[in-house]
Amino acid sequence: MITIKNERELQSMRQACKITAAARALAGEMVKPGVSTKAIDKAVYDFIVSQGAKPSFLNYNGFPASACISVNSTIIHGIPGGYVLKEGDIVSVDVGAFYQGFHGDCAATFACGAISTEAQRLIDVTRQSFFEGLKQVRKGNRVQDISHAIQTYVESNGFSVVRSFVGHGVGRKLHEDPEVPNFGAAGRGPRLLPGMTLAIEPMVNEGTYDVRILKDGWTTVTADGKLSAHYENTVLITDGEPEILTVTEGL
């Protein structure tokens, strides 16, 4: 069921999203050679808790960390651990915070030091594809108007969108209806209504869109071992322009 948030609920959700966005920015600042993914996860946990919130991902369906940290060919759900970042890595950080009964959810891919031109292009196209989709976030449009815009932009740049995982509604639950694919024909799916909140999250691969899940049951990698990037914000549908609830200057 798709939930419509009232203004009182949105006040709490805006604060949850503000905390989430700040945690993403903090994680991004830590993406440097010599830093372990576990250290980034601890910083995310400490920050979220310091704000009176809870990490949305920690123990969610058994996930063992506060942030999903996915390096290079890992698309999503990377489990932080002892891996030490090195020059040239690209690092996707996905975070969520639960505050006053509501979740925020956002992600971005960061460059670790100097990266290849193609890796930077992948990051840039992934981010811009979100904003291409955002142009379709208007009252009365349909969910797959967003999907089609993202897919069209990504594929026109020679990359592929992941099919196996999609964006989603977000609110009192981390994952709510509707699903928001990053692919598909325009004009399909539920209509967008004011008060809906969506986590729009292009996951873009350098090569094939096929994925493989590792034995830990979480870590999802590209089937061909090529790079992947991720960009996500929580967005509110309004009567006019959409509102990015996890907005962060420069991200």
Which residues does each PLM region occupy?
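Active-site neighborhoods and metal-handling regions in enzymes and metal-associated proteins
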Residues: 1-251
